[in-house]
From Swiss-Prot:
Name this polypeptide is given: PDZ domain-containing protein 7
InterPro entries named in the record: PDZ (IPR001478), PDZ_sf (IPR036034), PDZD7_HN-like (IPR042786), USH2_Complex_Protein (IPR051844)
Tissues and organs where the protein is expressed, per its UniProt entry: Weakly expressed in the inner ear. Expressed in the retinal pigment epithelium.
Subunit structure: Homodimerizes (via PDZ2 domain). Component of USH2 complex, composed of ADGRV1, PDZD7, USH2A and WHRN. Interacts (via PDZ domains) with WHRN; the interaction is direct. Interacts with USH1G. Interacts with ADGRV1 (via the cytoplasmic region). Interacts with USH2A (via the cytoplasmic region). Interacts with MYO7A (via MyTH4-FERM domains).
Keyword Glycoprotein: no
Source organism: Homo sapiens (Human)
GO CC annotation, single: extracellular space
Keyword hit for Nucleotide-binding: no
GO biological process terms on file: auditory receptor cell development; auditory receptor cell stereocilium organization; detection of mechanical stimulus involved in sensory perception of sound; establishment of localization in cell; establishment of protein localization; inner ear receptor cell differentiation; sensory perception of sound
Amino acid sequence: MAQGFAVGFDPLGLGDLSSGSLSSLSSRGHLGSDSGSTATRYLLRKQQRLLNGPPRGIRASSPMGRVILINSPIEANSDESDIIHSVRVEKSPAGRLGFSVRGGSEHGLGIFVSKVEEGSSAERAGLCVGDKITEVNGLSLESTTMGSAVKVLTSSSRLHMMVRRMGRVPGIKFSKEKTTWVDVVNRRLVVEKCGSTPSDTSSEDGVRRIVHLYTTSDDFCLGFNIRGGKEFGLGIYVSKVDHGGLAEENGIKVGDQVLAANGVRFDDISHSQAVEVLKGQTHIMLTIKETGRYPAYKEMVSEYCWLDRLSNGVLQQLSPASESSSSVSSCASSAPYSSGSLPSDRMDICLGQEEPGSRGPGWGRADTAMQTEPDAGGRVETWCSVRPTVILRDTAIRSDGPHPGRRLDSALSESPKTALLLALSRPRPPITRSQSYLTLWEEKQQRKKEKSGSPGEKGALQRSKTLMNLFFKGGRQGRLARDGRREAWTLDSGSLAKTYPRLDIEKAGGVGPVQKFVTWRLRRDQERGRALLSARSGSPSSQLPNVDEQVQAWESRRPLIQDLAQRLLTDDEVLAVTRHCSRYVHEGGIEDLVRPLLAILDRPEKLLLLQDIRSVVAPTDLGRFDSMVMLVELEAFEALKSRAVRPPALRPARQDTPPKRHLITPVPDSRGGFYLLPVNGFPEEEDNGELRERLGALKVSPSASAPRHPHKGIPPLQDVPVDAFTPLRIACTPPPQLPPVAPRPLRPNWLLTEPLSREHPPQSQIRGRAQSRSRSRSRSRSRSSRGQGKSPGRRSPSPVPTPAPSMTNGRYHKPRKARPPLPRPLDGEAAKVGAKQGPSESGTEGTAKEAAMKNPSGELKTVTLSKMKQSLGISISGGIESKVQPMVKIEKIFPGGAAFLSGALQAGFELVAVDGENLEQVTHQRAVDTIRRAYRNKAREPMELVVRVPGPSPRPSPSDSSALTDGGLPADHLPAHQPLDAAPVPAHWLPEPPTNPQTPPTDARLLQPTPSPAPSPALQTPDSKPAPSPRIP
């Protein structure tokens, strides 16, 4: 279920207990092990290992269990979701934050901002409707329940949040559920019918009685576990009874339902509230009903609606097929819902106050995904996420410390059959397959075809469509020679002829791939010479190839060659290569084949096609063919080997959402490397970016439509105001209810960010207000208002101007002593550059001099670079994750690159945009990927770089300089620095170590000295040098 049903066994850390309670209670298992059989315990442990897998850091499994999302929200895998904004919100003097949240992992969703009050601190900080909160004060909200998220958001008066700007908020349209129960009497599992719950159908059945339990504060242990809660649409059930405990002595049995405790009704109470009631009293009066069953897990299927556009006040979805999620968990609810006044099939489900909770650390999440063929007529992408099944956890009603005087064995331990049923009741993980691989059945079918095929078909190449198998792995069947080297053979013209083997770098060992390749060539030539001598002594007819067999072999290999050629070449080049190969097969002439091929295959990655064309060459022409292409292949292979880098397209899976399925294909870049990209390429992302820009201009309709009779099993999904939340403390009174809300028009379940252009004054008025505000508060801010302007190519989820960086995208810096300004790598022309100053904004008490040093001012300049050079030849540093240098700057320019030859770029320039794509307020890795992708795109020539030339900065005062000596910059505040080239930096390019031992460590940038007579301070630590890094392609 969404959160477990009991308080002692929390295998996945999904409960609402504090971390201390979970750590102390997690050692008590759900099923006893003293009297259970060894086979049963082994099976349980094996099932648990298969379910959880090895721990992979502090990530909790989703309480949704197995989730299948169809037509998922745009947060799944979009460019906009990669843009992380830093927002800092402080409570107002009245103690309000001014925003509401929606979602939660119990619904298979993240935490979304659904409402932002006008004039609140959240609105001033730049928080927008549709933002997905991923982190708060260093705590991740990925796979977090709503109760836990609200507890984190209300635990501090100052929130530093990392959000992803999605521009939309989820809402549930339809839901149905199915619960699996453990029948204690008949020792079997019972699956309820859709729409009926055993607790509802048997509400009047069973014997009810009142049980009094007396404990002491020193030895508090009730001796039973509970499951259920209103967040799951279930009551509170007893799932385990300790052998010889207090509950067993008073007649409480497994399968009993707790109807009330100390006057608090349990028919509409959350799991954590029930735990508080049961654990907080020394005298507990329980109302018990015998049901003979308790819930094991629950399946839920939900459908979510997503707004596309607004026409005539009616909300429209992206497509008729809405998002649906199916989860093996317990996240249903039987809470009452308000019905709308407008006839429609949608409703904004309201969620009551969720209880706070926390998750146990150290449990991994198993996510698999597959992509179906996208619909040509729609814009909705389909993805599937499968998460491990979660059996509802138990909460043990006992004290945290051990009690050696009592046995806490389970009553179920006396019945291994029940334990075995529970272990086998977990739904098997679905069988998934990636479309880049072949199943075992397909491999067997291919082997049968190879055995039963013609000799020409037996020689056909078997190729995997992944990058590593395409380039390094051996795709042909090989055998081990006497010296242990692998050789590939193909059957052609009735005789065995050696073909070009796949190079396996992993098995090369101490011998380099180039040396192995050359050795193989020499040994093969020697063996070919001996084979020719022996063939001359034989019959003349054996030397002549059969034309029919050669044509048949060409026809069998033609689809494979064309498939690879289409990935490496243009359409015209593919036709030319096919035409030349066909002419050679029918007419002969190896020179007429090689010369045009070498002209067409003019790049290292294109020369990979020669490996497959070699299989078409007749055995008598192989020697001539190899002598003509051997040197070119060696050079190409060495170039590819030196440029092998990790493809940036293979991003690590994020924790919030499972990966979206793509049909991938290896695509070569201009440097000879390969990247695994979607079959549709980048146009799909561009279309999505245009769609998001259009959606950003939409506004929310005040009139929404909602169904009159919503489905009973729909889990609530309401806007939870974080300001109205107060931790619930239950004694002997019923849980407090929410205050009544005045009737108002229901808002739609999908909320978009409203455009603020009509509400915003002109830029000059904004600047004047910001200056007056900064004077009234007697503090300066760190960024100018230039962030309101965007480059033409920047993709933004909404047209809202970028708020002040100090409150939204910036970070508050702790008050530090002043640092001397960095030396400017400019010549005499730098003094002539006019600095464009905006209203300075900073969260610290500083002087104008400090603001000038922190505020990078300068003139915007457009620089064009040619992409004809092999490498761009620059390295960059900084990024939004850096507290010292949030902007991206050029760190070093390497000789021989395109940047060096242009002469217009210098170290220290700030990169603002590249080929129309904005580089402001982006992470370091995103800036690296953007620059690399722009330089690889040879279709856009030349490359346009918008840089900010730094202006002259005031010299620091002696007091400031001396103050800097006392307080150094911590090492963890160094900006992310990653040069963007693949070639190592020679030693003579590195700076000399500084001689002044009192120079503080800074961001380790390499700048050219200025012509000023004063010596420039060294920008690195005395005992370290900046590590050389590869250049940009």
